[in-house]
Amino acid sequence: YFLDKTYRKESGRSMFYEVSTEVMEEVESQLGELNGEAFQTTMTDFWTAVQELSKDPSSSVTQGLIVQRASEFVQRASAVYAGLSSYQDNLNTQIRQNVDKINKYGNQLLTLNDQIRAIESGGIEHANDLRDARNQILDELAELTNMSFSEDRYGSVSVQIEGVDFVKDGTCYEIAMKTDEATGFVTPFWPMNASYTTRDDGTRVYNIDGAEVFDLSIEISSDLGTDIGGLKAMLLARGDHRANYTDLAEGKYDSVSQSVVMNIQGEFDQMIHNVVTKINDILAEAAGVQSGDLELADGTTLKNAKYCAVDSDGYMRMEDGTPIQLFTKVTTDGYRKVTGKDGKDYWVMNEEKADSPESLYTIGNLQVNSALMQEPSKLGFRLADGSEDKKTADALKAAFTEESYTLNPNVQKKTTFVDYYTDLVSQVANSGYVFRSIYENQVNTVEATQSAREQVVGVSTDEELSNMIKFQNAY
């Protein structure tokens, strides 16, 4: 019993790290190679175009190149993010399948309990084959979940998963799944521990708060025994939503930090967001956008607004006078028109709000300015006096080499636009290496426990064969 218990705990831990290692390898391949081309190439091409622009800002060739590279940058970023999201869906499918498998095992255990009890109740026969089959199921369950088991004097086995009764007294308390309407992600929960309301058609709507099978907010560590079971590893890796840069904000980061896929989605989106907003801000400054409080005609004051006077003939402006943006949002405008207390019209930059996805410059809401795609020379880079705007072109170049960005709030090292993606991939590779080494150590532990267990439980084939020969000779 002790060796069974040890073996099952260690094999559950082994599966946790096996899944975690596979997830890291998949994420690394998503980041490294997409249709044979790494995103780093796209980033390097964009950086090269910015350097070319700084050499000859008013050339229609360099302006055309930067718009083209910006467009590729957005397309490739979308493809990487879509790949990560698709992998979340893949994990979600595996989670569904494994919950179904666990429930199937639970019902099989009930049947085997009944059969074993029936055979052994007389106290003469021993249901060895049935016990072997039951042990096999317990081994499989132990790989998927953090389970414990006990056998009563009648030969029936009870099982707990994550400390909650799963098989007990002739009942299998099946795990149910609640599907998130926005993402389709499922959360395994215990129906007997959840409250519910009943619809008119008789279907139940569950409130699963506190009834989840796994508490994913607890820190993962071997000391706490929270690193056991392949299903938990899948749930952690998938996360509970599609993350973006707002998830990396101080105070929010803990909710995504333990999920490999959400963490990378957030860090990758943050990189794209930083590049996009920095470039737009540099162009806005050239167009005369300033920061400060703006008093409006209706008596209200916009605090810390970014705004400029409406000036359709101004430098770095569109026909309607809005400051030119290289990157625009798909769902909302970059600027809105307001009337100031002085009676003049102003363009005010629309602020990003974390709780309003359509206001954000995130990967799913990004495009290159369609007017610039058609006519890159709108960028101009020629000031009112006819001179080249070298200052703005140089500012764009400098933006790529400023060491002022971190991957996430827990990382101290500052990085640049040029190196950010490489650092991101290295972080995944390093984490993957750590998971793999833990997994390999764990495999050795499982094998050692299994061989000790077999010495006690298993009969060697040689021994079995010689017993059969003895038995035949006796006839």
Task: List each language-model region with its residue ranges.
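Structural signature of extracellular appendage/secretion-system components
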Residues: 1-475
